[in-house]
């Protein structure tokens, strides 16, 4: 089971999601998307909350209101963190999550520590209450969704390559036509010059 939430403080809204327990967190880690940003309470046990961005967005593009929603949601889903104020929440792109065979279930590390950001949050109940009203329980096929996403990306890249090749072919055709036109113009000019010279020669014999 995966819990989905909607951050509708801005338009268009953003989708957040988290697993029910550490076992589902394993699947979320495995089948995350490059557009996902991972959130967790720093140095405490908590849910793994993911924010899904648009393809053209980066972690720097997250609106501060949405960032706060994610932080409040992950804080509220920490047994210790939910009782504390001014706790640190860490967040990083899904691609920066590192999972090795010797790690416990639900445990992760980072490929690059410099890509991990930290923010300090206080408890704001009204934000958590607003998010809870959007809560939706689903049983998604995460592997199938990831494959569909990757397939779409492959098709987009294929279409882009085909478009580039089409433009290159078109440019080559135009260049060839221009070269032929210049060659024809040069030939006509040469023939005209020869014709004029022939005319001058005939005048000399008169």
UniProtKB/Swiss-Prot annotation:
Entry keyword annotation includes Cell membrane: yes
Amino acid composition bias (Polar residues), ranges on this chain: 183-199
GO cellular component: endomembrane system; plasma membrane
Ranges that cross the membrane: 115-131
UniProt-listed InterPro entries: Jlp2/Ccd25 (IPR039730), NFACT_RNA-bd (IPR008532)
Pfam families: NFACT-R_1
Stated name of the protein: Coiled-coil domain-containing protein 25
Lineage summary: Eukaryota, Metazoa, Chordata, Craniata, Vertebrata
């Amino acid at each position: 089971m995966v819990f989905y939430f909607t951050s509708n403080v801005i338009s268009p809204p953003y989708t957040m999601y988290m697993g029910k327990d550490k076992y589902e967190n394993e699947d979320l880690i495995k089948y995350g998307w490059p557009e996902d940003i991972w959130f967790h309470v720093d140095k405490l046990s908590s849910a793994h909350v993911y924010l899904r961005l648009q393809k053209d967005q980066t972690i720097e593009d997250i609106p501060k209101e949405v960032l706060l929603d994610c932080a409040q949601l992950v804080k509220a889903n920490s047994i210790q963190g939910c009782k504390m104020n001014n706790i640190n929440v860490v967040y990083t792109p899904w691609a920066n999550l590192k999972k090795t065979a010797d790690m416990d279930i639900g445990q992760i590390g980072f490929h690059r520590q410099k890509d991990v950001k930290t923010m300090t949050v206080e408890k704001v109940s009204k934000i958590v209450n607003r998010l809870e009203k959007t809560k939706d329980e689903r049983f998604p096929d995460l592997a199938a969704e990831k494959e569909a996403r990757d397939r779409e990306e492959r098709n987009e890249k294929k279409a882009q390559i085909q478009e580039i090749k089409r433009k290159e072919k078109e440019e080559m055709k135009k260049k060839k036509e221009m070269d032929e036109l210049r060659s024809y113009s040069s030939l006509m000019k040469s023939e005209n010059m020869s014709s004029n010279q022939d005319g001058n020669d005939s005048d000399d014999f008169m």
